[in-house]
Amino acid sequence: MNVLSYSINTLKGLYEISGVEVGQHFYWKIGGFQVHAQVLITSWVVIVILLGSAIVTVRNPQTIPTDGQNFFEYILEFIRDVSKTQIGEEYGPWVPFIGTLFLFIFVSNWSGALLPWKIIELPHGELAAPTNDINTTVALALLTSIAYFYAGLSKKGLGYFGKYIQPTPILLPINILEDFTKPLSLSFRLFGNILADELVVVVLVSLVPSVVPIPVMFLGLFTSGIQALIFATLAAAYIGESMEGHH
């Protein structure tokens, strides 16, 4: 009976897990539009965390930096290094964009593991990390696409489109397809990794004692940071590529 009872409880847990699906959403109706409330709520929380921590830490810069100021200066230096390595000497104007991408994705990813989203109940679906939703990752990828098109056009003008027939016009369809696959790969890589990480933790918490999933959660924090770095690095690389014209 104990085995049967355990099996039934396990099946119930799996059934509850199956409710965590990509298609469950909670919407706000504003005028004639449906607004994806889950993503907006969690994104606002992440933005408030970023702005609040930055304002509190660096509103009064000190000649002898405080620990918080040192931390933010280190982050800025890190983002500048990534931008300069991928874009080149003209990296300066792109540091805010690359930094915004990196910090938003990084904090969003970590919020999925560290913030107790589940305690806030919604009529439909549940709150999770913003990057756990395909709408967020696609939006970030499209912003990156707009950025590297803008970078190429602002530097080369209409001559930028000449890259599509290099080194031979035969490669025109492939070169066009490449620009369409870049945002797809960026968005689905980030979305898939974050969604899979959260689902693995949910499954383990449901099936085994609470202490066992802790190492997996720490691994998830590490991979979440890596995913933010990969996204920002690739975005900078695409911008640098569009300005230089090399594939």
Swiss-Prot record:
<feature type="transmembrane region" description="Helical">
    <location>
        <begin position="134"/>
        <end position="154"/>
    </location>
</feature>
<dbReference type="InterPro" id="IPR035908">
    <property type="entry name" value="F0_ATP_A_sf"/>
</dbReference>
<keyword id="KW-0138">CF(0)</keyword>
<comment type="similarity">
    <text>Belongs to the ATPase A chain family.</text>
</comment>
<keyword id="KW-1133">Transmembrane helix</keyword>
<comment type="subunit">
    <text>F-type ATPases have 2 components, CF(1) - the catalytic core - and CF(0) - the membrane proton channel. CF(1) has five subunits: alpha(3), beta(3), gamma(1), delta(1), epsilon(1). CF(0) has four main subunits: a, b, b' and c.</text>
</comment>
<keyword id="KW-0793">Thylakoid</keyword>
<keyword id="KW-0375">Hydrogen ion transport</keyword>
<feature type="transmembrane region" description="Helical">
    <location>
        <begin position="199"/>
        <end position="219"/>
    </location>
</feature>
<feature type="transmembrane region" description="Helical">
    <location>
        <begin position="38"/>
        <end position="58"/>
    </location>
</feature>
<keyword id="KW-0812">Transmembrane</keyword>
<dbReference type="InterPro" id="IPR000568">
    <property type="entry name" value="ATP_synth_F0_asu"/>
</dbReference>
<dbReference type="Pfam" id="PF00119">
    <property type="entry name" value="ATP-synt_A"/>
</dbReference>
<keyword id="KW-0066">ATP synthesis</keyword>
<dbReference type="GO" id="GO:0003729">
    <property type="term" value="F:mRNA binding"/>
</dbReference>
<dbReference type="GO" id="GO:0009535">
    <property type="term" value="C:chloroplast thylakoid membrane"/>
</dbReference>
<feature type="transmembrane region" description="Helical">
    <location>
        <begin position="95"/>
        <end position="115"/>
    </location>
</feature>
<feature type="transmembrane region" description="Helical">
    <location>
        <begin position="220"/>
        <end position="240"/>
    </location>
</feature>
<comment type="function">
    <text>Key component of the proton channel; it plays a direct role in the translocation of protons across the membrane.</text>
</comment>
<dbReference type="InterPro" id="IPR023011">
    <property type="entry name" value="ATP_synth_F0_asu_AS"/>
</dbReference>
<keyword id="KW-0150">Chloroplast</keyword>
<keyword id="KW-0406">Ion transport</keyword>
<keyword id="KW-0472">Membrane</keyword>
<keyword id="KW-0813">Transport</keyword>
<protein>
    <recommendedName>
        <fullName>ATP synthase subunit a, chloroplastic</fullName>
    </recommendedName>
</protein>
<dbReference type="InterPro" id="IPR045082">
    <property type="entry name" value="ATP_syn_F0_a_bact/chloroplast"/>
</dbReference>
<dbReference type="GO" id="GO:0005886">
    <property type="term" value="C:plasma membrane"/>
</dbReference>
<dbReference type="GO" id="GO:0045259">
    <property type="term" value="C:proton-transporting ATP synthase complex"/>
</dbReference>
<keyword id="KW-0934">Plastid</keyword>
<dbReference type="GO" id="GO:0046933">
    <property type="term" value="F:proton-transporting ATP synthase activity, rotational mechanism"/>
</dbReference>
